[in-house]
Amino acid sequence: MPYPEELIAPMRQDLVQLGFQELKTADQVDEVLGTEQRTTVVAINSVCGCSAGGMRPGVAVSLGNEIKPDVLVSVFAGQDLEATERAREYFTGYPPSSPAVALMKNGELVYMLERHEIEGRHPLEIADTLKAAYNEHCSVIPEAPELPAV
C-alpha cells in the first residue's frame, strides 16, 4: 500500500529540486527509457533511511561533477508502483532494489548502484562512485567557443 503523499512529498522534492523528472506511470517510463539515446540517470527513490541519508544526498553531490548524465529521472518505490515495476524491467540482470541508481546509455543499462552498495556508506562515497560511472559512460559537453572581442 502506498504511503500518504504528504509524507513522501519532501522526499520527492529532494530529487525534483535537482532537476529530476518524476515518472509516475509505466507509459512515462517507456516514453523516456524506451526512446532516450542520451545518458540517463534513473534514481529509484524510497522512504528508507539509506535513501534519505545516502542515496539522495550522494546523487546531489555527484551532479556537481564536470561530466554528468544528460537526463535525470526518478521513480518512487513503494509509491509509484507501476512506474517502478516498469523501470525495473529495463534493469536486466538486477533484482529489484530500492533505493538504487541506474545509468542508461543509448537505451541500455551500463551501470547500477544497488541498495547494498548504498547502505552504510557516506553520501560522499556514493557521489564518488557515481562520478566514476559518469566519467566512464557520459560525454563532456563541449563549451561554446569564445567569441572575439568587437
State the predicted function of each range.
Residues 58-60, 88, 134:
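Short, well-ordered amphipathic alpha-helices
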Residues 1-37, 138-141, 145-149:
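N-terminal leader/targeting and pre-domain segments
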Residues 94-142:
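Non-catalytic, surface beta->alpha helical segment in thiol-disulfide oxidoreductase systems
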Residues 31-66:
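Local sequence-structure signature of Cys/Sec-based thiol-disulfide redox active-site neighborhoods
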Residues 23, 44, 67-86:
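Thiol-based oxidoreductase modules, predominantly thioredoxin-like and allied folds used
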Residues 52-57, 84-85, 123-124:
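Conserved strand-to-helix beginnings and helix N-cap segments that scaffold or border functional pockets
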